[in-house]
């Protein structure tokens, strides 16, 4: 569990924590949404920080709300090194209560890509970048043109 290994915990510096910070994000941020989640983001020069809002309207049981937050924190922890700087607040929607953990994680990654916070994945089946081939020296048997 994360409590036994402090290196695996989600650091305080990577969280939106106070009401004032949430208010700034909600008032000045751009928004994009998915059937499961809504993302409010504000770009900046600061390291990326995550805030979550999972209300009782989403799931009346604390177990369900905590599961959603746990999945989002874990996904954010893995994406933190490649994430653009700024504040990101995720608002869970009621459909998230019935979604599986991979569905929630995929929706989160999809929203971050749509926001431009993550690089787009390479399209499957695309060719790798072309290598530059240096012209070889002419062979002594072939005539030069």
Swiss-Prot record:
Pfam families in the record: Ribonuclease_P
Group of enzyme by EC: hydrolase
Reaction catalysis annotation: Endonucleolytic cleavage of RNA, removing 5'-extranucleotides from tRNA precursor
UniProt record, GO biological process: tRNA 5'-leader removal
E.C. number: 3.1.26.5
Gene Ontology CC: ribonuclease P complex
GO molecular function, one term: ribonuclease P activity
Region annotation (Disordered) ranges: 119-145
Keywords: Endonuclease, Hydrolase, Nuclease, RNA-binding, tRNA processing
Purpose: RNaseP catalyzes the removal of the 5'-leader sequence from pre-tRNA to produce the mature 5'-terminus. It can also cleave other RNA substrates such as 4.5S RNA. The protein component plays an auxiliary but essential role in vivo by binding to the 5'-leader sequence and broadening the substrate specificity of the ribozyme.
HAMAP family named in the record: RNase_P
Complexes and interactors: Consists of a catalytic RNA component (M1 or rnpB) and a protein subunit.
Protein family membership: Belongs to the RnpA family.
Protein name stated in the entry: Ribonuclease P protein component
Organism in which the protein naturally occurs: Xanthomonas euvesicatoria pv. vesicatoria (strain 85-10) (Xanthomonas campestris pv. vesicatoria)
Lineage per the UniProt record: Bacteria, Pseudomonadati, Pseudomonadota, Gammaproteobacteria, Lysobacterales
